[in-house]
């Protein structure tokens, strides 16, 4: 699914906190918006062939990527996220802004992945 121009504008506005935290807008494609500070990348996007949206956090030097949707889910006591693609992205950006120091910490993300794996067992 493509990001329409209105959604892109809304997402870019909601992502301004990343710019204030020394991230730069790196790329905008039909389905993703990417911010990076050369160590970590936030890849915000819609799945190409599905009605799903998500934000991935990639630790570039370590070459490790984490799904912010799952992190938010397990860290917020399994509170479900909105089903609307744009609302889901905005909710995840809000979570990332409020928990910026945590979600940009590799250990926090790794611990969250373990929580997800335990949840899925």
What positions do the PLM features span?
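Hydrophobic strand positions within the blades of repeat-based beta-sheet folds
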Residues: 18-19
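Intrinsically disordered, low-complexity regulatory regions enriched in serine/threonine/proline
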Residues: 1-13, 25-121
